[in-house]
Design a protein with these regions (language model features):
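Catalytic cores of alpha/beta
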Residues: 1-12, 54-68, 101-107, 111-130
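Active-site-adjacent beta->alpha loops and helix N-cap segments on the catalytic face
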Residues: 1-6, 22-42, 56-61, 78-98, ...
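A generic, well-ordered mixed alpha/beta core segment in the N-terminal half of proteins
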Residues: 10-11, 17-23
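Conserved beta-strand positions in the central sheet of alpha/beta enzyme cores
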Residues: 17-20, 50, 71, 129
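Short secondary-structure boundary segments
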Residues: 22, 53, 74-75, 109-110, ...
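Short, surface-exposed, charged loop/turn segments at secondary-structure junctions
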Residues: 34, 67-71
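Short beta-strand/loop segments at the ligand-binding rim of alpha/beta enzyme cores
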Residues: 41-51, 99-108
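Charged C-terminal helix
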Residues: 150
Length: 150
């Protein structure tokens, strides 16, 4: 959801939550995250918003802006987090985020086994998003093939 155009289109469907890219990446028109967040809040004050973050710093910043949910969606997928795996050091990043933010944390991104879901739920996240692990048959098949090649 990079611009208000997409937000307006989504609002026609009456979504429960809308996620915004809360990284330091450039947005169309050079709009900052703070400017975009404030514009969405002004137009749709009751809409629940989730910050898709890739680093602790982004999560803390998004929390300060007032996002309803802080997501780990983009951990490992940005230049700033390319060497980070969500499960590193026993999910240390999630633990740090939980300790530093006041809004609900949603674990998302590489939470691809029941064991990982159980682990992060036990840490106190509000919810877990399991995406590719269940929605893309080619990704599921790839993991089986990798296991057979060992």
């Amino acid at each position: 959801t990079p611009t208000m155009k997409e937000i307006d289109e989504l609002m026609e469907a009456k979504p429960e939550i809308i996620a915004l890219d809360a990284t330091n990446r450039l947005r169309p028109g050079g709009v900052t995250l703070k400017e975009f967040y404030n514009a969405v809040r002004k137009e749709y004050p009751e809409q629940l918003l989730m910050a898709d973050c890739s680093t602790l710093e982004e999560a803390v910043y998004a929390d300060g802006l007032g996002f309803d949910f802080i997501g780990t969606t983009l951990v490992g997928y940005t230049e700033e987090s390319k060497d980070v795996r969500i499960e590193q050091n026993d999910f240390a990043l999630i633990r740090e985020i939980l300790n530093r933010v006041t809004h609900r944390v949603i674990a998302e991104g590489n939470i691809n086994t029941p064991e990982k879901v159980h682990k992060v739920m036990g840490m106190g996240v509000y919810s877990v998003v399991v995406g590719t692990a269940i929605t893309r048959p080619q990704a599921i098949t790839r993991e089986f093939v990798k296991a057979l090649e060992k």
